[in-house]
Amino acid sequence: MNTYTENEIKTLEWNEHIRRRPGMYIGKLGDGSSPDDGIYVLLKEVMDNSVDEYAMGYGKQIVISISDKVVTVRDYGRGIPLDSLIVAASKMNTGAKYDNKAFKKSVGLNGVGIKAVNALSIDFKIQSYRDGESQMARFSKGILTEQERVLTSEKNGTLVTFLADEELFGNYI
C-alpha cells in the first residue's frame, strides 16, 4: 500500500521554514561557544545592514549594544522606507540590494538575512526613522505582534533589537 498521498505535501510559511531549517540560512545553530555558531550570524546580519548604509556614505555612526542577551543595533543612515518596513522584515527575497540603484556596495544576504533574525528571535523589533516620522514593527518568531507609526524628532536611521530564541539556540553566551 502506498502511504505517500496529497496529505504528505506541505507548504510552510517563510518563518516556519527558517525555524525548521535554520542551517539553510545561518549555518549551525550553536550556543556561542564556537565562532561559527549561528547566534553570531544573527548579530552579523543586523550589523551588515548598518555597515552597508555607512559604506554608502549615509550616517557616520553605528551603535551596538548587548545586554541580558538582547542585541540592539542603531544606525543613522537613511532608514528603511516606512511603508516598506514590515515587508522588508518579513517577506522573503524582499530587499533593496538586488541591483546597484540604492546600494552600490553590500555585504548582506540580499533579502534573507534580517528575515532569518526575525524568525529565529522570540522578540524582534525594527524601527525606521525618516524625515520626522517613525514606523515600528515587533515580531515574535516571525509573527507580527505590534506596529506603530508616529511623528518623531529622532535622527534618520534604523533601530533593530532582538532576543534570539533559546528554544533553538539553548542557553547561549
Listing of model-derived features with the role each one plays in the protein:
Residues 33-62, 113-120:
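Conserved ATP-binding N-box helix of the HATPase_c
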Residues 2-38, 83-105:
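P-loop NTPase nucleotide-binding/switch module
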Residues 12, 19, 40-41, 57-60, ...:
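Short loop/turn elements that form and flank the Walker-type P-loop nucleotide-binding site
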Residues 48-98:
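Conserved beta-strand-loop-beta-strand hairpin that lines the nucleotide-binding pocket
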